[in-house]
Amino acid sequence: MAGLLGAAVVVGAARTWLIRAFRIQERDPRLAAPGGSETAPEGVAARVPTRRNRTLAARVFLPHPGRPVAVVVHGWGAGGADMLVLTEPLRRAGFNAVIFDARAHGASDDESFASLPRFAEDTEAVMDWLAARGLGPVALIGHSVGAGAVLLVASRRPEVAAVVALSPFSHPRPIMNTWLAAHGIRWRPVQDALNRLVELSIGHRFDTIAPVNTIKAITAPVLIVHGTADQTVPPWHAEAVAAARPDVPLMRLPGVGHDDTPGFTRHLDAVLGWLKGVVPG
């Protein structure tokens, strides 16, 4: 009995440590700032209901009535405000846009923890909010964890018109192992145990949410985009995802890093040119 109690204490302590370690410490509230209107360059603020009675802070840009909508998903620890740089290029390319803060990020409601599946749930909440207003078709653009989220959504939502995955990781496990090693946890059995604890905590096996697997179930056109100088999610991750679907193009961006907004901006015309070519409407 004492052994079981001791094990329970260790597991509980490890789970608490992981949750605290992954909590977003700084949150950018800019997305909630009042805007002009849905057709104005600055868009308009909105609150979108999502799971567990939470709401999301969103910014809605509808300069093109009846045209497709790009739903843009930020990465871990970032926020929708970091993706506002995309709104003007999207407008020029003929797209409407919605940018939002995932739960526990930016000006959205707090949550017990954030995870790739919850990013995906929030993306679907925005899609449902748009569908209730008769807006679409919807294309998804996601960065980093947001890229994994949009691939997961598209694997189970066939109405998605197209997906752009920016800097996706291939599988959560190597990302977690790298993070654990950076925190002094390098022994593989301990890494494996903590990875399993994360799976139990988020309610999903890593294999079921890994981009290298979810991309196989997507019927919509997909573009993978990755910077060759990405040190956070090294380029081999994108190579692995692309190898899982040889028909999916991989756009390599020379010298571009992970959170490299100027670098990505230099290549937006090519990325949005592809998107415009595959999305009807």
Give the ranges of each region predicted by the language model:
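An N-terminal hydrophobic leader/cap segment in hydrolases
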Residues: 1-49, 57-59
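The serine-hydrolase catalytic nucleophile loop
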Residues: 76-89, 102
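Conserved alpha/beta-hydrolase
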Residues: 89-109
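Alpha/beta-hydrolase active-site loop
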Residues: 113-133
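Hydrolase active-site cap/lid region
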Residues: 152-204, 260
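Short beta-strand/loop motif that positions the catalytic acidic residue
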Residues: 217-219, 224-226, 230
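Conserved alpha/beta-hydrolase "acid-adjacent" motif
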Residues: 231-237
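Catalytic histidine-centered segment of alpha/beta-hydrolase-like enzymes
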Residues: 256-268
